[in-house]
């Protein structure tokens, strides 16, 4: 009888009249029998309905809009594995062209036909590759000098993205962190150098700090390192984590020196699926010259029909994102990227100004140097408020927006902030809708007679340990 019902569901029964739609979706075991594609599609699609719509997700840095031609091109390549270079040699060529384009955007001095770089599944893998290269170069030099090489370290601000903590744990490399303060909101070069020694593999400035949106001053760090290395005899290099800024600075601030124009910058990592304007996941890392990419990082296999050499932590990876990146470079060109990033920046600055005018709030920084920023409650308002920024996050989510609230990293953990990332697809009109929803929520909060549960919990936590109440599920994610 069930077979008859299944045939009817497939041929003539409406999807929501089918037996499958009366049953729960599988959660632990694979179903015994096949399901028609129409019903399977609907069941999976229904699972996504309660979620925030991607373009309203202002927590993420990830691209949520590409044009129809880009989407079509990527869909047509969904079955292509990048690593199969023998079968798909043109994909590898396009990846190499993308590396060349980015290397030249970042003023690479390398004269080779193909610049030294690697594809990654995201900026996290790209950071790992840049860090590993610095570690292997340092280790090789220490071995050659007959010196110990068992205690490597690197220096970064407390505004680091979690990948650097993973890097430290996985490769057992000490991470030395330079604290941020309200007065010093980016990496302090002198403090960074005070943490360096003969075991320092690199210093990592960040262009587009995940927590704040600000840029570390790479040029100032480079000048300081020039003097430091000359005095000590060390040759500590810089790896720039430009997950966001790598696709912003070349187009909006081309004269700013943060890249390979600086002596000690030997590698740069970025994300193609953030402001590179490609759907996830895609990252890139470029070295100043092939000599800075250790041979130990290249691995070869011969079981795919030819001898294939690659640099990366992952092996198989989708080719669609490579086609998407190459398409964007061709489709948009320099001026197209500049126009899109300029629009995002202009809208971010507009929102920054409007939120700064709202009675409860104060912006973390007067500057908007990337298309994102953070703000917090004014201390005098916070002392008597019956609500918190976590409540505002929840209220906005009821209207479809995702605007995260979170605590800042160590040394600033008493500050709960909110952040908006302005990406391609976030228009001025949508921004006005968001600002209206924010103001409406604040108006309702100010009518409260009693504090919210989050406010009670936060105040209690402050009295007990002197820290703000933290929603552990809210992250500043990348």
Model-derived features: where do they sit?
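A short glycine/serine-rich beta->alpha loop
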Residues: 26, 59, 82-87, 113-122, ...
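Structured alpha-helical segments in the cores of large, soluble enzyme domains
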Residues: 95-103, 160-164, 188-196, 314-321, ...
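Short, glycine-/Ser/Thr-/acidic-enriched flexible segments
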Residues: 159-161, 182-183, 208-210, 245, ...
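Secondary-structure capping and boundary motifs in well-ordered enzyme cores
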Residues: 90, 119-126, 156, 160, ...
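Active-site C-terminal subdomain of aminotransferase-like
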Residues: 251-254, 258-370, 376-381
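Conserved PLP-enzyme active-site core in the AAT-like
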Residues: 2, 7-14, 118-299, 304-307
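A generic structural motif
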Residues: 177-183, 231-241, 297-300, 312, ...
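Non-catalytic terminal extensions of PLP-dependent enzymes
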Residues: 1-111, 132, 138, 142, ...
């Amino acid at each position: 009888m069930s077979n008859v019902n299944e045939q009817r569901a497939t041929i003539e029964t409406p999807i929501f009249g089918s037996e499958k739609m009366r049953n729960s979706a599988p959660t632990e075991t694979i179903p015994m029998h096949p399901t028609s594609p129409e019903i399977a599609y609907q069941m999976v699609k229904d699972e996504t309905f309660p979620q925030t719509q991607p373009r309203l997700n202002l927590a993420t840095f990830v691209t949520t809009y590409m044009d129809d031609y880009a989407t079509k091109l990527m869909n047509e390549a969904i079955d292509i594995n990048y690593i199969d270079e023998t079968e798909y040699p043109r994909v590898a060529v396009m990846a190499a062209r993308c590396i060349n384009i980015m290397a030249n955007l970042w003023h690479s001095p390398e004269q080779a036909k193909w610049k030294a770089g690697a594809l990654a599944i995201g900026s996290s893998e790209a950071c790992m590759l840049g860090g590993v290269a610095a570690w292997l170069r340092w280790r090789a030099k220490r071995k050659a000098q007959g010196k110990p090489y068992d205690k490597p370290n690197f220096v970064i601000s407390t505004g680091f993205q979690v990948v650097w903590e993973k890097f430290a744990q996985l490769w057992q490399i000490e991470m030395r962190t330079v604290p941020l303060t309200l007065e010093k909101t980016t990496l302090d070069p002198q403090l960074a150098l005070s943490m360096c020694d003969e075991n320092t593999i690199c210093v990592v400035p960040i262009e587009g700090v995940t927590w704040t949106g600000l840029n570390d001053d790479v040029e100032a760090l480079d000048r300081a390192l020039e003097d430091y290395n000359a005095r000590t005899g060390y040759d500590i290099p810089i790896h720039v984590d430009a997950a966001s800024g790598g696709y912003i600075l070349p187009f909006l601030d081309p004269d700013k020196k943060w890249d390979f124009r600086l002596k000690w910058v030997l590698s740069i990592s970025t994300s193609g699926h953030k402001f590179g304007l490609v759907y996830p996941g895609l990252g890139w890392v470029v070295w100043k010259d092939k000599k800075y990419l250790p041979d130990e990082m290249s691995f070869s296999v011969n079981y795919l029909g030819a001898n294939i050499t690659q640099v990366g932590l992952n092996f198989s990876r989708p080719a669609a994102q490579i086609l998407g990146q190459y398409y964007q470079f061709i489709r948009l060109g320099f001026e197209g990227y500049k126009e899109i990033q300029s629009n995002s920046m202009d809208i971010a600055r507009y929102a920054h100004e409007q939120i700064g005018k709202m009675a409860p709030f104060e912006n973390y920084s007067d500057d908007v140097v990337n298309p994102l920023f953070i703000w917090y409650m004014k201390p005098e308002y916070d002392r008597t408020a019956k609500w918190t920024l976590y409540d505002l996050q929840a209220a906005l989510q009821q209207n479809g927006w995702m605007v995260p609230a979170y605590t800042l990293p160590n040394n600033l953990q008493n500050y709960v902030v909110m952040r908006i990332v302005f990406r391609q697809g976030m228009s001025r009109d949508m921004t006005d809708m968001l600002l209206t929803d924010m103001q409406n929520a604040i108006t309702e909060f100010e009518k409260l007679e009693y504090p919210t549960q989050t406010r009670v919990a936060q105040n209690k936590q402050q009295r007990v340990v002197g820290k703000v109440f933290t929603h552990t599920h809210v992250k500043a994610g990348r």
